[in-house]
Amino acid sequence: MHVKSIIIDGFKSYAQRTEINGFDPLFNAITGLNGSGKSNILDSICFLLGISNLTQVRASNLQDLVYKNGQAGITKATVSITFDNYDKKQSPLGFEAHDEITVTRQVVIGGRNKYLINGVNANNTRVQDLFCSVGLNVNNPHFLIMQGRITKVLNMKPPEILAMIEEAAGTRMYECKKIAAQKTIEKKEAKLKEIQTILEEEITPTIHKLKEERSSYLEYQKIMREIEHLSRLYVAYQFVCAEETKVRSAEELKEMQDSILKLQDTMAENERKVKELGKEIAELEKMRDQEVGGALRSLEEALSEAQRADTKVQSALDLKKQNMKAEREKKRKELVKSMEEDAKVLTAKEKEVKKITDGLSSLQEASQKDVEAFTSAQQHFNAVSAGLSSNEDGEEATLAGQMMACKNETSKAETEAKQAQMKLKHAQQELKTKQAEVKKMDGGYKKDNEAFEAVKKSKEKLEVEMKKLNYEDGREEQLLEKRRGLSRDVNRLREAYESLMARFPNLQFEYKDPEKNWDSDRVKGLVASLISIKDVSTATALEVVAGGRLYNVVVDTEVTGKKLLEKGELKRRFTIIPLNKISARCLGKDTVNVAKNLVGADNVNLALSLVGYESELQKAMEYVFGTTLVCDTMDNAKKVTFDKRIMTKTVTLGGDTFDPQGTLSGGARSQNASVLVRLQELKDVQDELKAKETELQEVEKELMTLKNTVERYRQLKQQWEMKSEEAELLQTKLQQSSYHKQQEELDSLKQTIEESEETLKNTKEVQKKAEEKFKVLEHKMKNAEAERERELKEAQQKLDTAKKKADASNKKMKEKQQEVDALVLELEELKREQTTYKQQIETVDEAMKAYQEQADSMASEVSKNKEAVKKAQDELAKQKEIIMGHDKEIKTKSSEAGKLRENNNDLQLKIKELEHNISKHKKDSADAAAKVAKMLNDYEWIASEKHLFGQANTAYDFKTNNPKEAGQRLHKLQEKKEKLGRNVNMRAMNMLTQAEERYNDLMKRKRIVENDKSKILTTIEELDQKKNEALNIAWQKVNKDFGSIFSTLLPGANAMLAPPEGQSVLDGLEFKVALGNTWKENLTELSGGQRSLVALSLILAMLLFKPAPIYILDEVDAALDLSHTQNIGQMLRTHFRHSQFIVVSLKDGMFNNANVLFKTKFVDGVSTVARFAQNQNGGSSAGQQRSDKSKTKERRNRMEVDK
């Protein structure tokens, strides 16, 4: 198969339709100037063959292949090649029937890329398979040798050279297919894993589950059948029992009615006898009362009198105690309250007095200063009046004296300046001498000083790092000590908490979570544990108010409560308060205010206001405490409870309860502390425990955080201490060195120089000031009279100003003093009131003591009265015993009458029992009749099978089948049926069949895939072996031709392909070249032309091994000289007689050997092609073809491309 003609339209430089006809079946050459479009012909062939790497056709995308990228009005590129297919041996698969094959490829800008084979649309894969089947794989082309291919072959690595051999041997396609097959196997493997996962995770568990459900379903059916059998037996037995009960009840009813009549007769006889005995006893008692009745009455009257006296004294004692309690609690409380309020005022006044006193002190100091200023101004005025003048220090002196002092200052300054000048000069000379000496000994000191500075910097760096750690030295030890202390506290508090909890088992609400992921916040807890008492004195009252509700459980909703009751496994009975459903009522503010106005605001409170609780618990607390008032005393409670405006239940602090319905409860209470008081103690311990545990956790957390920091800090500190020691040693060494001493002397001299210079400067300033002052004084001396008048006037002004200021300060101070005195008086008054309150409280306490003494005296009187009552009771009892001694006959008759009454009572009980039984039998009889009727109505089979009930050898044989046991069995079976019925899957049988079918189907598909995989792997193994054999044969053949061709092109030389050292042919191949008898280590030892011949020889050897129908060479002779080029051309002509060559070359030696030569030109921006047929000697005929517009139009109808 070879190229016959090419049609190019809009492709690269071929703007117009260009037909290139008359290709020689063997050797064709293309030549032309650079840029004329000769390589574009080869690019068009590659484009048609389906090249994917567009860089090989010098383009970045398909749009670049269109003439001028579509900018010149041409929007598509089309290439059409006609192949000669007369040689059926080289025909592509499936095209043996065609003598010619025309393949067209077209790309449209912004459109799609399409192929046509013989005018029919085809996809890319089909075109690729067509060309690959004849060895024209353009994406791995051994038949295409483009510009630079020789260089590329020279740079190939061993695996790449092996790939060329594989391509020539035809095993490359197998490798590609093998890789594709392996990827397919991997995908199938993934599918197998997916199937296995589905089997393991879905189907198999489903089958197991359905099998279990099938067992449950079969068991359910079995139970249903047994229930049906036992139900009939049990219903038959109940029917028989009901009929027997109906008959038996009627008989027993008649017997009981007869018994009642007999018992009533006996009772009437007993009643008659009791009446007779009563008359006899009354006559005997009348006789007894006449004899001893007077003494008994007098004793009874004495007892009654003693009891009245006892009650009166006891009431007086109770009233005294109550008054004493009210007095102590109310009056003393008021005094203490007033005392505390005054104490607060006293504290505030003391602070105010302190503040004003501080202000007074400031004014006194200011006033004192103003007085001193006034005194000084007065003295100055007096001095000026006397002819004196003030100097700079404020001292009074004459002008002459001041002028003399200025002269002395000037003289003193001149002397000090001369001394400083001499000292400066000496120090400067000494400094120069010492500096020269120091320079000589500078080396060693400098080195030590540098070392000291380096250590100092290291030390500073360590200090910075330590500072960055933000760790305080000893912090870890503090935390460890704190942790030990907190651990002890936590253990102590936990023991105390557990001990207190053990004493209150009723306050523990334990339950099991009713469901998974249960939110414990839904259960708030017991009412007792949810409140806190504001005042401990109210604990008893609050406990009475709450009563049993103190142990109720508060939850968020009724659903939570239901779940707790059903599934919480509570150990005892609890009442539950759901916050969303509880109906709570609370006394209104108006009612509470009425009660407070009635007995005093501090004497009554709503129970709800005396407890603390969370806001979300408002409804529950109103339900428990919202409708009861708490009063301080019984009197106040009574007033509040029965007031018509209030009429509300009230409880006293002592626990006594008053109810508006008229009931009163109270009395002695347990001496043990209130539950709420102990509970408050428990809460305090719990709160403290939580706080300590939180603090301990924070300490633990901080210790964990500090762990790494402490370690790092210790390391840095150790390094810092070492550096500090090193720095101290170096500093000591520096200080002890002679250089250091000399340096100190130098510093001392420098300081002396600075001091001397400063002294010189100061003396000059002093001298200058003194001279200026002398001039001023001299001027004053000359104008003494005018100056004196001016100073006198100024002194008078200063005096007046100072006097005014002193008077004003004194006035302010006095006003402030008065204010302080007033406050001090108030303060003293308040202190006296505090003392008075204390005395009044002591007086109240003494009065309480007197009250207590009176109460003790009254208690003694009560005790005496009780003894008198007891004595009267004893005498009355004795008298009654005497009387009873006379009553034996009465007793006997009374005993007989009593027995008769007891007999009547017993008979009455029997009658009632019989009446009850009659009523019961009537009911049983009616129930049995109704039951029989209902059963006949409900179970239609009873009427037809009634005659079999209880008969032997039937399904209703009650002797063989115990009906009671059948009933128990039936009950158990029904429970089991209910349990199974909730979970049994009625569709289990069908679902199991479907699941098993799906399982079997998947297993079948899995086996098929595994078998296919096994066969593919076996085939790959066999083909790998054949591939290796074919590869060895190809290598040997190519190697032989490679050496032969290279020897021909370069006489005296030899070449071969050999595997790299230590590897096999299957790992790769590399070039081995010998010039003469010397084998070169690598190709770098050869010249450029020799290397090119090596690569070209290999390419030609490949072509000889498995000739492709077409070979394309693009300037492969570019790097060769003319002699080598001519040799190549002759070799192609003489040795390759079975393939078509299309060669692009610029050298005569190459294209003169071609049978047909195509020459390209670039005319008016468009490429054109001319054909020249050449003879054996290289001459050319004039039969050339040009692609012009006229020829294009003539052939367009015949060769137009389907667009």
Swiss-Prot record:
* Ranges where the SMC hinge domain occurs: 522-640
Q: Which GO terms describe its molecular function?
A: ATP binding; ATP hydrolysis activity
Q: Which residues form a coiled coil?
A: 172-513, 670-1032
User: SUPFAM superfamilies per the record?
Assistant: P-loop containing nucleoside triphosphate hydrolases (SSF52540), Smc hinge domain (SSF75553)
Q: Which residues form the signal peptide?
A: none
Cell compartment(s), UniProt? Nucleus; Cytoplasm; Chromosome
Q: Which Pfam families match?
A: SMC_hinge, SMC_N
Q: What is this organism's lineage?
A: Eukaryota, Metazoa, Chordata, Craniata, Vertebrata
Query: Which keywords does UniProt give here?
Result: ATP-binding, Cell cycle, Cell division, Chromosome, Coiled coil, Cytoplasm, DNA condensation, Mitosis, Nucleotide-binding, Nucleus
Q: Which family does it belong to?
A: Belongs to the SMC family. SMC2 subfamily.
Q: Where is this region: Disordered?
A: 1174-1203
Q: Which gene does this sequence derive from?
A: smc2
Q: Which PANTHER family match?
A: STRUCTURAL MAINTENANCE OF CHROMOSOMES PROTEIN 3
The UniProt entry, under InterPro entries, shows: P-loop_NTPase, RecF/RecN/SMC_N, SMC, Smc2_ABC, SMC_hinge, SMC_hinge_sf
Function, as annotated, reads: Central component of the condensin complex, a complex required for conversion of interphase chromatin into mitotic-like condense chromosomes. The condensin complex probably introduces positive supercoils into relaxed DNA in the presence of type I topoisomerases and converts nicked DNA into positive knotted forms in the presence of type II topoisomerases.
Q: Where is the composition biased (Basic and acidic residues)?
A: 1186-1203
- Write out the domain note: The SMC hinge domain, which separates the large intramolecular coiled coil regions, allows the heterodimerization with XCAP-C, forming a V-shaped heterodimer.
This protein is called what? Structural maintenance of chromosomes protein 2
Q: Does the keyword Nucleus belong to this entry?
A: yes
Describe its assembly: Forms a heterodimer with XCAP-C/SMC4. Component of the condensin complex, which contains the XCAP-E/SMC2 and XCAP-C/SMC4 heterodimer, and three non SMC subunits that probably regulate the complex: XCAP-H/BRRN1, XCAP-D2/CNAP1 and XCAP-G/CAPG.
Listed Low complexity bias regions: 1174-1185
Q: Name one GO cellular component term.
A: chromosome
Q: Which organism is it from?
A: Xenopus laevis
Where, by residue number, does ATP bind? 32-39
User: Which parts pass through the membrane?
Assistant: none
Q: Name one GO biological process term.
A: cell division
Disulphide bridges: none
